[in-house]
Amino acid sequence: MNTTTRTRMRPEERRQQILNVALELFAKRGFEEVTIGDIAAEMDIVRPTIYIYFPSTNAILDAIFENLLESYWQKLEPLIKSAGDIVPNPQLVSKAFRIMHSEPYLLSILRCGGPSFQKKRHAQFNKKLRALLEPYTNSDIPYISPIIGLLIEGLAYWAIQENIQDTEELANALEQFVSHGLDKR
């Protein structure tokens, strides 16, 4: 017999608790290895409680992605707006890399859930990045926004996977790379 006292939560608190627990489980085991039952067991609740909020683990993953992406944009948007009309700006790119590198869960979520989910999430990410960058871009380089976005995301993911300790050195190298590329136009 379970003697644990359950705590009643407001719906938004319960929803957020589900997202937090699911994120931790996805990070530990990988998205494909986590079920609604696993999340419920970790929370000591019954599965139907989770189904009140989310119809599937894919829906949970999408909600987590939205939250993480919003957090990233809230950190990135002021940097872009303060850069004025000098985007692409090498310093801005290295700052965006630092922010992305500090969001390992976002990077993991971008790469899990199968090809169709990855494509959908990358499309969301790139659409938002283009919307943020294009008003400030006076570049004659075609596709500059997705190039910068993929460079930042890919390098941040690689640095985490390879356990690169000196991210400042990597950010500076990225800044030099972008600066060199812009000087050659």
Positions of the model-derived regions?
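Hydrophobic alpha-helical segments that form the core
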Residues: 95, 99, 139-181
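Short hydrophobic/aromatic patch on the recognition helix
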Residues: 43-54
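Amphipathic alpha-helical segments used for helix-helix packing
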Residues: 88-126, 157-161
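Alpha-helical DNA-contacting segments of helix-turn-helix folds
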Residues: 61-68, 118-121
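Hydrophobic alpha-helical connector segments
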Residues: 63, 74-102, 148, 171
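Amphipathic alpha-helical packing segments from all-alpha helical-bundle domains
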Residues: 73, 114-146, 169-172
